[in-house]
């Protein structure tokens, strides 16, 4: 509720700054970015190599998001710093579904790992830029295992949705399963992350030309909107899996 109010208020401010009485879609888009990611830091300068790494990282997210049908849809990619992030990929769910299939979680894990996969493929090493991606991917995998019963452990709920000290053990939680089960939870979370990682790497290897092309576009334009992304994918004939 509070976030929606913030988005609406920020959109109204943006419209007023342009002397417009009506709020347009672009105002909501820009306000969502500001509320979720923080204000633009156009004066924030980074080294050329870091800028190149960020371009490939964000391109990796965008390409995986496009290729996997159940991943969140990518609407914008930018290498302009916002908040603490050096770049960002704005992705939103395609539909407001009340029921989320297992494949959507799996595809979203792969999309989140797409940036790190691009770094590894192009620069042969990874950076700290994927720390938030790893946190979110691990959270999805943990919920798949312990909350939704979407793992090889079967349809069973294993713990509450709170912060965990370890992957399979929660802080202040009354232990309802053995150390052996906790270890299996850890293994399942790691397996789901590994599956997503291998999927991201394989897809980017297959579409390496697209990765280079999009990174180059980002380095030249800094931001790619919906239409820019569609043009890249259409020009290079990139089809969804």
Explain the meaning of each model-derived region:
Residues 1-26, 33-41, 62-74, 144-151, ...:
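AAA+ ATPase "lid" subdomain C-terminal helix
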Residues 29, 35-36, 53, 81:
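Metal-dependent phosphohydrolase cores
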Residues 49-56, 62-241:
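Soluble catalytic regions of large protease machineries
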């Amino acid at each position: 509720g509070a976030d929606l109010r913030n988005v609406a208020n920020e959109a109204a401010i943006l419209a007023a700054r342009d002397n417009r009485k009506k709020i347009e879609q672009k105002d909501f888009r820009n306000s969502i970015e500001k509320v979720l990611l923080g204000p633009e830091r156009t004066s924030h300068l980074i080294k050329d190599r870091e800028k190149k790494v960020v371009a490939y990282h964000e391109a990796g997210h965008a390409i995986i998001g496009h290729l996997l049908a159940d991943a969140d849809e990518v609407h914008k990619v930018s290498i302009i710093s916002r908040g603490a992030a050096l770049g960002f990929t704005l992705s939103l769910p395609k539909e407001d579904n009340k029921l989320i299939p297992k494949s959507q979680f799996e595809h979203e894990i792969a999309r989140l790992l797409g940036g790190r996969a691009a770094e590894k493929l192009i620069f042969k090493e990874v950076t700290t830029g994927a720390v938030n991606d790893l946190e979110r991917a691990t959270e999805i995998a943990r919920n798949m295992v312990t909350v939704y019963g979407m793992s090889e452990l079967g349809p069973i709920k294993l713990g509450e949705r709170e912060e965990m000290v370890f992957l399979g053990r929660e802080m202040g939680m009354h232990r309802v399963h053995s150390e052996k089960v906790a270890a299996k939870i850890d293994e399942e979370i790691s397996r789901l992350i590994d599956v997503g990682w291998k999927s991201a790497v394989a897809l980017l290897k297959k579409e390496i030309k697209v990765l280079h092309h999009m990174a180059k576009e980002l380095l030249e334009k800094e931001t790619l909107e919906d239409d820019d992304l569609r043009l890249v994918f259409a020009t290079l004939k990139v089809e969804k899996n």
